[in-house]
Amino acid sequence: MTSSFRQKGRLSPDPPQTGRQPDGRTGRPAGARRQAAASGQQAIAARLLASRGASGIPHPGGTLLAHLERVSALLGQWGARPPVRLAGLCHAYYGTDGFPVMLGEPASRDELAGVIGEEAERLVYFYASCDRHFSYPHLPEPAGAFRDRFTGTVLSPPQAMRRDFAELTAANELDIATVNPELRAQYGPALLRLFTSWRNLLSDPAWRAVHTTIASPVT
């Protein structure tokens, strides 16, 4: 049974601006304040991940925490919004269909949401809950049928959520392909086919990175 995807909760509004913020003469511009707030959230989230053992879990390229930080940085290079970058940093918090190690429980989602915000946490859960075998082929379709592997529910998420998911997936897979040439050689052709089928969901920077990383010959 297919149901529409409903997002939990609402984002908190930006703090009220005071003075002539846009030109910075009487205070920091709104964009700078948001960037500073996002950087603070990143640091707090990284400490949470480290406290849950992410800095000691082996992962291609070093540790899980190092991988998570690289994914977040890559999303930033592509111009992703702060919530997407935060989700990239925490994308393995509930484990994934390809990496079963959990740092936190899906039954306690408020804990992570309290650190990175509800929008970012929704994407973390969405990414973690993906039944990849079922969902990947449907993701670029108009309805975008998506199966939650934790509950078995089939959803029809909005395209904006699917775009964020595709961007995060690309950053995750391209980081692994970059740091591990053997895995790149083994899985690169399949990843290229996957991301080609998702072209309508990927940003131009992400699409260029796909070709730079996995479409060129392995040397």
Where are these regions (language model features)?
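Charge-biased, low-complexity intrinsically disordered regions
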Residues: 194-213
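Charged, compositionally biased N-terminal leader segments and the immediate start
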Residues: 36-45, 50
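Divalent metal-dependent catalytic cores for phosphoryl transfer on phosphate-bearing substrates
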Residues: 51-58, 64, 71-197
